[in-house]
A protein has these predicted regions:
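A generic transmembrane alpha-helix motif of multi-pass inner-membrane proteins
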Residues: 121-127, 134-142, 320, 329-333, ...
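Hydrophobic transmembrane alpha-helices that form the core helical bundles
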Residues: 17, 21-22, 39-70, 74-82, ...
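Juxtamembrane transmembrane-helix boundary signature
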Residues: 1-33, 42-52
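Hydrophobic alpha-helical segments and their helix-loop junctions in multi-pass secondary transporters
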Residues: 105-132, 149-165, 330-339, 365-371
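Transmembrane alpha-helical segments of multi-pass small-molecule transport proteins
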Residues: 41-44, 68-90, 106-115, 284-298, ...
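Extracellular/periplasmic helix-exit of transmembrane alpha-helices
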Residues: 7-21, 161-169, 198-228
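Membrane-interface loop-to-helix entry segments
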Residues: 79-80, 88-118, 319-324, 346-351, ...
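Loop-to-transmembrane helix boundary motifs in multi-pass membrane proteins
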Residues: 36-37, 73-78, 240, 254, ...
Length: 371
């Protein structure tokens, strides 16, 4: 995870710059400059992966709520889905974004878990700095899945879209390519991206270390739901660790569901030419908000289907990882064109790490397919 941080930062910053400089999202920019069949294929895979992710997240929250408070999981799933959809549709962006920012603090539950369990920190340090990856299909599939959760197309779409939302409610709502004083905005994007991706990487490492030091170390490797993971922690690390993990699942789900549904709506709306934006009223962006509601509903439906949510989550991450490489390459090309970015074309370091990130994702995907 530490070694992928520069690629994560580069890709998210490229996404943010495209949105803020052009005033168009990732799908909207691809629609204007890329072949339509490529755009439709990318968006179709994004929608499928997002809906499966929504189902896994809603199902995870429901199972944890059942563990903590009792009651049928499907009732909790419906309640969480309804709450997330209603809040995202009816709360204005400028207020809603504050809710999401404060909710990221819930992710610290996974970091707190490390302080209540035993961790062999020397072994962790060696493994982090010198990671070992077995060159077989199973290992490379998991590598693509892990990369697909951190360098993921839905995050590209969301990052660019939120830059546009912020721009439209700012004192000067013009895209940067129409302004000559964009240096401060670029610096702000740079600082925000490094801070956000650093925080994301910290939480991801905490989850990996925490589960490896407890569940995997005690032979618990077949987990069907996050609630089972929380329950399995109790006899190993105590009830407090179980509670912390459970609260982390709830907080993560409440943060992830709106982002997944929102990125689905942004991508589809930009592709179809619909009005979009969380600052718009529901009646002014019907297709956009209908997509949010439908994606969340379909995700909740997975909870009562025979689909194994954890396996589905892994394969959704694999899809994200496989799609990410071509999308990153397209973003680097577009971000390097003066006809698209004006005076704000990507600097060399972003292009280098952008191409490096694309190569990493493609190489892992090809290795997964051919070995």
């Amino acid at each position: 995870m530490v070694l992928t941080l520069p690629f994560m930062v580069a890709v998210q910053e490229i996404s943010a710059r495209i949105g803020r400089v052009t005033g168009a999202g990732i799908a909207g920019t691809l629609r204007a400059h890329a072949p339509r069949p490529l755009l439709l294929a990318i968006v179709a895979l994004l929608v499928v992966a997002n809906v499966v992710n929504l189902g896994a997240d809603i199902g995870g929250m429901a199972e944890v709520a059942r563990l903590l408070a009792g009651g049928p999981a499907w009732v909790w799933a419906g309640g969480f889905a309804l709450f997330c959809a209603v809040v995202e549709v009816w709360v204005a962006y400028r207020r809603y974004v504050l809710y999401l920012k404060y909710l990221t603090l819930a992710l610290l539950a996974y970091v707190a878990l490390l302080f209540v369990i035993h961790v062999a920190w020397l072994r962790v340090l060696v493994a982090v700095l010198v990671p070992h990856v077995a060159l077989n299909r199973a290992a490379l599939t998991m590598l693509v899945a892990v990369l697909g959760t951190t360098i993921s197309p839905y995050l590209f779409v969301w990052q660019a879209a939120e830059e546009i939302e912020d721009m439209q409610i700012s004192a000067d709502p013009r895209p940067l390519r129409e302004r000559a004083d964009g240096g401060a905005e670029i610096a702000r994007i740079d600082a925000d991206t490094w801070g956000g991706m650093g925080y994301s990487n910290l939480v991801s490492l905490a989850i990996i270390i925490g589960t490896a030091a407890t569940l995997h170390a005690h032979g618990v490797t077949d987990i069907a739901t996050p609630a089972q993971a929380a329950q399995a922690l109790a006899p190993i690390a105590g009830r407090f660790a179980e509670l912390i993990f459970a609260l982390g699942v709830l907080g993560t789900g409440l943060l992830a569901v709106p982002v997944l549904a929102g990125s689905t709506a942004y991508a589809l709306s930009e592709t179809m030419g619909w009005r979009e934006g969380l600052e718009r009223k529901a009646g002014d962006a019907r297709g956009f908000y209908a997509t949010i509601a439908l994606a969340t509903l379909l995700g909740a439906g997975i909870v009562i289907s025979p689909i194994d949510p954890m396996r589905a989550l892994v394969w959704a991450a694999v899809i994200n990882g496989a799609v990410a490489g071509p999308v990153i390459a397209a973003m680097v090309v577009l971000g390097s064109l003066r006809s698209v970015m004006g005076d704000y074309v990507l600097p060399p370091w972003l292009r280098w790490f952008g191409w490096g990130g694309a190569a990493l994702m493609v190489a892992a995907t090809v290795g997964m397919l051919v070995l």
